[in-house]
């Protein structure tokens, strides 16, 4: 009994830290980056100032393809605003902009060899699925039936 109490006391005593954790000042942590430190408000061209009209046939097609229900007014407004935003970003001029591979472009990226370390576990993984077809998972359909 005494041995057990000594172990408990030692564990409690040994896990207490006497060092205070330092607060990090994130403004001092700087890396060479092309990401601006302050938000940039870009003026998108207002190409779709007019209201977007969606006919019922297009809405039914989107519902069937995306497996979502667009019956509510809020869902239609979200869809229209998404279409307007997509229309705005398609008009951004990116002709002379080089592709950005990483945010920290001046740091060397350490890549590892792409080797398979574990494998041959297809049967084990597929055993967790309720329905499979030709070694593929079969996901349940959404809230809209596919047959129309």
From Swiss-Prot:
GO terms for biological process: glutaminyl-tRNAGln biosynthesis via transamidation; mitochondrial translation; regulation of translational fidelity. Keywords: ATP-binding, Ligase, Mitochondrion, Nucleotide-binding, Protein biosynthesis, Transit peptide. Its main location: mitochondrion. It catalyses: L-glutamyl-tRNA(Gln) + L-glutamine + ATP + H2O = L-glutaminyl-tRNA(Gln) + L-glutamate + ADP + phosphate + H(+). GO terms for cellular component: glutamyl-tRNA(Gln) amidotransferase complex; mitochondrion. Belongs to the GatC family. Allows the formation of correctly charged Gln-tRNA(Gln) through the transamidation of misacylated Glu-tRNA(Gln) in the mitochondria. The reaction takes place in the presence of glutamine and ATP through an activated gamma-phospho-Glu-tRNA(Gln). This is Glutamyl-tRNA(Gln) amidotransferase subunit C, mitochondrial. The lineage of its organism: Eukaryota, Metazoa, Ecdysozoa, Arthropoda, Hexapoda.
């Amino acid at each position: 009994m005494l041995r057990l109490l000594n172990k408990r006391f030692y564990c409690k005593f040994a896990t207490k830290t006497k060092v205070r954790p330092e607060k990090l000042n994130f403004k001092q942590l700087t890396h060479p980056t092309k990401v601006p430190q302050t938000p940039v408000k870009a003026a998108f061209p207002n190409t779709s100032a007019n209201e977007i009209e969606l006919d019922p046939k297009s809405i039914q097609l989107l519902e069937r393809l995306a497996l979502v229900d667009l019956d509510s007014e809020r869902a239609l407004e979200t869809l229209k605003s998404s279409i307007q935003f997509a229309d705005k970003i398609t008009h951004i001029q990116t002709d002379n902009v080089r592709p950005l591979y990483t945010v920290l472009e001046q740091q060397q990226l350490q890549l590892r060899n792409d080797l398979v370390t574990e494998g041959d576990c297809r049967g084990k993984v597929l055993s967790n699925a309720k329905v499979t077809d030709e070694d593929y998972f079969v996901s349940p359909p959404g809230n809209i039936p596919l047959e129309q």
